[in-house]
Structure formats: structure tokens, C-alpha cells
Amino acid sequence: PMKKHEMVLVFGKSASYYKPQLTEGTPYKRKWTPNKVNNMEYGIAGVITDNKGTRHPTTILDFPQQWRRQDQLHPTQKPVELAKWLIEAFSNEDDVVMDNCMGSNTTGLACKELNRQYIGIEKDKNYYDVSVSRVLS
């Protein structure tokens, strides 16, 4: 109840790959002067930072659900756009993505759209059947 954060765990064979999925914000220019105390001699006249409005994501990713409650296939179903965002941030095309609690198979649908290989695990036979038919349709 009243939870703002839900954990997303990312595992890989080697050091994590991360390609930031930047969000849109207000463009800005910022001027700053380096500190002489820290032995920063270059740019004493000031450095101008020009940003077109892109921002790194915060800890809250806002993806509205795209279904009515009565159409929900699984109690913890996530939006496909959220799965796509995460998959694009942490994998490349043809990489293998595994979801060990696949539920309604949102991750599988996103992988199919993004050209990733996919391994899904679900212990509940009913949810497994629903998820397989969902990704095959």
C-alpha cells in the first residue's frame, strides 16, 4: 500500500551494460567558474553548459497502465512500455533477456518487439498458459 518504488533487478554475465533512456525536460544553459583551490586552472573565465533538455531518469519511472482493471491478466502486470524501456537500457539487439517471474509475459512481448531472445519462467500453470497465448497472438 502507498508504495512508490518497486525493485527491478538486472543481472548479466559481465559488468553491467547501461544505455541511458533519457527523458525530455526544459532546455537550459548554465555558466560556472572552476574553483582555483582544487587546482583547476583551465576555464577560469567560466564554462558554459548547454543542454537541449534531456535528463537522466530518476528513481521513479512513470508508465501508466494501458488496460482496464477487468482486462488485467495478472495481479502485478506491468505496462509493455516499461518493459521496453528497461530492455533498451540494459541490453542490445539479439541479447538474451530472462524473466524468472513472467506472469502475463509483458517482458516477452517487449523482447519480441525489440529483437531480443527471451527466456521466461512461471510456476503457475494458468498464468503460463495465458502468457504463452499472449506472446503467440
What are these regions (language model features)?
Residues P1-V130:
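Core catalytic lobe of class I
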Residues V132-S137:
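Short, conserved SAM-binding/catalytic segment
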